[in-house]
């Protein structure tokens, strides 16, 4: 019987879409296809009986109707995506964190309700998924706003969650525009093009400490170039105003406690500090040397910062001077200068590809162990085609990507699935983390897509 149901479900997934595409003139007189509010909704079975998030589930019964807009399915109390229904069978996708396993269906304006007698055995599994974006096999893409199901990107390279609205994620697309992901409405919109802000090459975005303004870094090869612009929330993040000037700046990092801003000059490799209270900037020191592209990422405590330096293939660490309210000179924390690779290891034994954006993520195991520093640092490693992380002790590990080795020996590509066994990225540059929902959002530049990793706990 179980094998029969699985086979039936597989056949249905094909037949359902064909029927939806072709249509049926007799639907109006088909009692199976239309929900009858005077009759009960019933669940007789579902298959498969177990699985993880994204499992395709078929629910069997009666009086479901065929209008998916009127059908709500919950697995383990979590809302599932309903793909289709023919009245006697619902095809849906198991959501993340459906741990409790109950299977429920609600239909119509009358909210007719049914619950399965048995539960779905949910298996926890953290995987890489695609949120939105598209590029075909020939590399053709279309940059456009719209719903997640029909939108496009140039190549997302930097992401930042709005601290006052976690459903809004702002991103730098290519180096030409600022766009926004609206998780609540599942849509993408363009906030501003570089020409509108009088920018040459967008590098990163950030929020001021209170979250009332959005900062934009501009890389322009001119002595009087606007290095950082500020856009107030009160103005809907429009009408950018220059804050500081520098030749070929890439950064606009904010100290999480004191709020001062750090920016740089790629030409000289200099790191600068800007004080909002005085409106003055000061040069701190040179990070490595000239032609040095880098970004500063502060630990949530503000005690130190990591500095990712893609051209040097290293991540440096700089302690914070609380008395003088500025970063101390940095030292190499992991990677070997000039040695590109993807080898995991500690300190200079690790090999990095091109470490770009990173974010600190609390490790609950560290909390249980009572460690002083409970954060790992996750970063997008462009040329390693992977998401990696470094521990407080300097151990570098590959978290996701470089999978599907049975396909070919090339570590890059576009594959969703298991973090290490299946998933592939292509030149990922951007990453941010929603701590509340335990979700990574990744700017997969080479695939022109936004990818996600929902930590299934």
Regions found by a protein language model. Give the residues of each.
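Ser/Thr/Pro-rich low-complexity tracts
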Residues: 24-130, 145, 164, 168-170
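Loop/turn-rich, solvent-exposed surfaces of beta-rich toroidal or solenoidal domains
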Residues: 355-395
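Blade-level signature of beta-propeller repeat domains, shared across WD40, Kelch, NHL, RCC1
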Residues: 425-457
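Sec-dependent bacterial lipoprotein signal peptides
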Residues: 1-23
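A short loop-to-beta-strand structural motif that recurs across blades of beta-propeller domains
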Residues: 176-180, 226-230, 269-273, 313-317, ...
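Conserved beta-strand positions in repeat-built beta-propeller and related beta-rich domains
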Residues: 162-163, 168-175, 207-223, 254-256, ...
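Gly/Pro-rich loop segments of beta-rich domains
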Residues: 59, 123-157, 185-203, 221-222, ...
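Hydrophobic core register within WD40 beta-propeller blades
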Residues: 159-161, 205-207, 252-254, 296, ...
């Amino acid at each position: 019987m179980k094998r029969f149901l699985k086979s039936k479900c597989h056949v249905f997934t094909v037949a359902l879409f064909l029927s939806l595409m072709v249509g049926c003139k007799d639907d109006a007189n088909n009692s199976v296809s239309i929900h009858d509010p005077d009759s009960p909704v019933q669940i007789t079975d579902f298959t498969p009986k177990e699985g993880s998030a994204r499992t395709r589930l078929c629910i069997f019964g009666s009086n479901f109707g065929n209008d998916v807009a009127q059908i709500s399915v919950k697995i383990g109390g979590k809302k599932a995506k309903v793909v289709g229904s023919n009245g006697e069978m619902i095809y849906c996708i198991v959501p993340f964190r459906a741990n409790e396993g109950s299977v429920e269906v609600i239909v119509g304006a009358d909210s007719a309700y049914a619950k399965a007698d048995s539960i779905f055995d949910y298996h926890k599994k953290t995987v890489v998924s695609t949120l939105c974006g598209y590029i075909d096999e020939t590399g053709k893409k279309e940059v456009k706003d719209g719903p997640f199901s029909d939108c496009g990107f140039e190549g997302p390279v930097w992401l930042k969650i709005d601290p006052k609205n976690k459903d809004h994620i702002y991103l730098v697309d290519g180096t030409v525009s600022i766009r926004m992901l609206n998780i609540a409405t599942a849509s993408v919109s363009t906030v501003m093009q570089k020409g509108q802000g009088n920018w040459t090459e967008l590098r990163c975005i950030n929020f001021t400490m209170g979250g009332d303004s959005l900062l934009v870094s501009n890389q322009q090869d001119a002595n009087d170039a606007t290095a950082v612009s500020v856009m107030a929330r009160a103005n809907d993040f429009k009408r950018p105003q220059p804050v500081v000037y520098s030749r070929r700046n890439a950064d606009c990092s904010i100290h999480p406690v004191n709020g001062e801003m750090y920016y740089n000059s790629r030409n000289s490799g200099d790191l600068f500090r800007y004080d909002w209270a005085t409106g003055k900037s000061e040069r701190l020191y040179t990070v490595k040397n000239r032609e040095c592209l880098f970004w500063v990422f502060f630990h949530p405590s503000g005690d130190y910062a990591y500095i990712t330096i893609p051209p040097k293939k290293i991540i440096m660490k700089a302690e914070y001077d609380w008395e003088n309210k500025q970063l101390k000179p940095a030292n190499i924390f992991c990677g070997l200068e000039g040695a590109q690779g993807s080898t995991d290891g500690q300190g200079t034994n690790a090999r990095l590809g091109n470490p770009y954006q990173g974010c600190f993520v609390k490790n609950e195991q560290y909390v249980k162990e009572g460690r002083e520093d409970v954060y790992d640092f996750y970063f997008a490693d462009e040329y390693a085609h992977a998401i990696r992380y470094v521990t407080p002790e300097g151990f570098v590990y590959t978290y996701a990507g470089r999978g599907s080795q049975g396909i070919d020996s090339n570590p890059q590509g576009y594959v969703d699935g298991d973090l290490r066994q299946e998933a592939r990225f292509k030149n990922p540059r951007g990453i941010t983390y929603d701590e509340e929902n335990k979700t990574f959002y990744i700017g997969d530049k080479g695939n022109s897509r936004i990818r996600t990793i929902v930590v299934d706990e």
